């Protein structure tokens, strides 16, 4: 008997993705995707780490102005992933977005390399002779520099959110009973491999810049970015490329508009509501959830004749939305408080320029008998080493051991991990303040109060604990937040989920700039404040204590947000599994 045309078409549609899943995607694509982001991170982080020194020496910007420029650049770099995620999910698709972004990053790095190669595009060298004033950078010179920063930010905005989601697309398989564990492991190892790239940036690239100069130090990242784009495009035939949906933000705006238009509508009782809400035929949601119930008015059918056409579809999508649209907006609104708690940790991590100046003023030898000095810009490697070590230990030792002891798979709830990371971030700032107090006190006792360029007789290894704590905090909260967003959001919002942590870092850098300037202005006594170009004259220990206090308040804020959020998707699923397991055990006992 011949199938009706619509059933045949449906069967072909179902079979097509299954065939694609067998022939494309999988672990084979991981080296190309991770290599693309890895090389991008080596290039961009390698440029960032020493950039404050480049701005102060070659462009003659003061510490506060130079750091403010870097705060804004990093903020733009971390904000652009939201734009990239929107374009990816709604218009371009993840593959094309990554290709365009790689080209933008490459152009930005070439322009930055040109600022080092061409003397006329930056201030002339400062000659230290009597009566000679050093010229400042002109508007056109700064414009070229900022153009390079902007192109790099645009590139990062397309690569970073899409690479993570694009990689997850290659592995995500709902038919696999271990799908959750595969994705959790993927997120951890993805961050670990990205962190290896950052580690290379903090060591190799920084070393090259310190010893071979800016021309080679900026040229190598450009070459790496070219290699990153080539490798990604080379593997194009192997990728699973999901189709884009309609504009996500348009759909969210329609929910807000429809809910407002029908704000006076009385919602049906819960037990009578199944047929009162508008949904598409292939939707699994028969009715919206009870949380943020006022948004349910957007998908409530008030008058079938006025709201629906003869084909059963909405006549006006700005007045009647689907249940899926409503739940997407709810998912986004619901995570905002939890998302905001990660901002303070990102503010703490963004203080690397001050830590760079601290390291430059200290004894950076590995031991008193050693002649090798760790470059000041390379101390960030201890943060990355701590992050990688935790990922490996957690994934390969802690979880397997706990699962073996309990006799069943064990996972540490993502909300617990995020909270622990925020508390460790508070400890990191408390340690930073204590170490800086000791460093400054030692510098003054050695008569170096007015000489920030001399080395204080104190080992820079005292800075390692705070870097390690920052790494643990980021491993717990950073990876935890990304996993949290990805599992709580619908799959059509994967790139948005991957970009939210970066958006938090963007907001953090803007707030860090505000806090920095506020502390500098409010602490000024005469011509000296807590924030000075000469760190021996300033009081960076007091500044760190301000951040530590804010971090502790943030931990309390997180506890409140976590409690009010309620159970996560994983918690609900695990409760169901545990309930079924208990029922099976009871049946076995009865038999």
Curated annotation (Swiss-Prot):
An annotated GO cellular component: plasma membrane
Disruption phenotype: Nrt1.11 and nrt1.12 double mutant is defective in high-nitrate-enhanced growth.
Expression (tissue specificity): Expressed in siliques, shoots and roots. Mainly detected in larger expanded leaves, in the companion cells of major veins.
Record's bilayer topology term: Multi-pass membrane protein
Keywords carried by this UniProt record: Cell membrane, Membrane, Transmembrane, Transmembrane helix, Transport
A GO molecular-function descriptor: low-affinity nitrate transmembrane transporter activity
Localisation per UniProt entry: Cell membrane
Biological processes, Gene Ontology terms: nitrate transmembrane transport
InterPro entries in the cross-refs: MFS_trans_sf, POT_fam
Superkingdom of origin organism: Eukaryota
Matches recorded under CDD domains: MFS_NPF1_2
Main location: membrane
Family annotation (PANTHER family): OLIGOPEPTIDE TRANSPORTER-RELATED
Function: Low-affinity nitrate transporter involved in xylem-to-phloem transfer for redistributing nitrate into developing leaves. Not involved in dipeptides transport.
Family that this chain belongs to: Belongs to the major facilitator superfamily. Proton-dependent oligopeptide transporter (POT/PTR) (TC 2.A.17) family.
Annotated protein name in UniProt: Protein NRT1/ PTR FAMILY 1.1
Organism listed in the record: Arabidopsis thaliana (Mouse-ear cress)
